[in-house]
């Protein structure tokens, strides 16, 4: 309670990890769900970052997973689900920031989770197809292919080509 009061006295909001302490509504402002054990509590907005750590899977599979994932396995945000965090959590020492961005496909992955957070939707929560491309010709496959086209168009215009290394997956057999 003392730390929460101190944080609020500085004009800041209180965010706590979950799993962790079980708070009452109004005690904190938001929870950060960082593992599968983390559960949103009704009345307390939650930020989902479970499996949103880059380099958790294969760098190309991350994009498929993030694009197809429902944030907190909900089809749309609501008062209890505030959004998601994507973290660059690389396993290897990278000499430069640019190496971290490129090696973890930050920009493509960032756009995938941003689209999901902005539009809602998705078709699972990492536990069905996970890193596997949806079946060719399916609604989900076609949506991913459309996303790839738009992503490549934007990234080729606004990102340094050295930081945006991507091979279109929806054309691969």
What residue spans do the PLM features occupy?
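Flexible, acidic glycine-rich loops studded with aromatic residues
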Residues: 14-29, 33-173
């Amino acid at each position: 309670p003392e730390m929460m009061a101190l944080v609020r006295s500085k004009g800041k909001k209180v965010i706590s990890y979950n799993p962790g302490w079980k708070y009452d509504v109004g005690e904190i402002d938001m929870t950060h769900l960082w593992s599968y054990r983390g559960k949103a509590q009704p009345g307390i907005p939650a930020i989902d970052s479970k499996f949103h750590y880059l380099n958790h899977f294969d760098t190309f599979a991350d994009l498929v997973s993030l694009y197809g994932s429902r944030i907190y396995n909900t089809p749309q945000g609501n008062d209890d689900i505030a959004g998601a965090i994507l973290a660059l959590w690389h396993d290897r020492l990278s000499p430069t920031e640019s190496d971290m961005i490129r090696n973890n496909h930050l920009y493509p992955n960032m756009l995938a989770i941003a689209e999901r957070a902005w539009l809602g939707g998705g078709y699972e929560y990492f536990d069905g197809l996970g890193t596997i491309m949806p079946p060719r010709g399916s609604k989900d496959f076609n949506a991913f292919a459309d996303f790839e086209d738009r992503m490549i168009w934007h990234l080729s215009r606004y990102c340094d080509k050295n930081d945006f290394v991507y091979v279109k997956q929806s054309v691969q057999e």
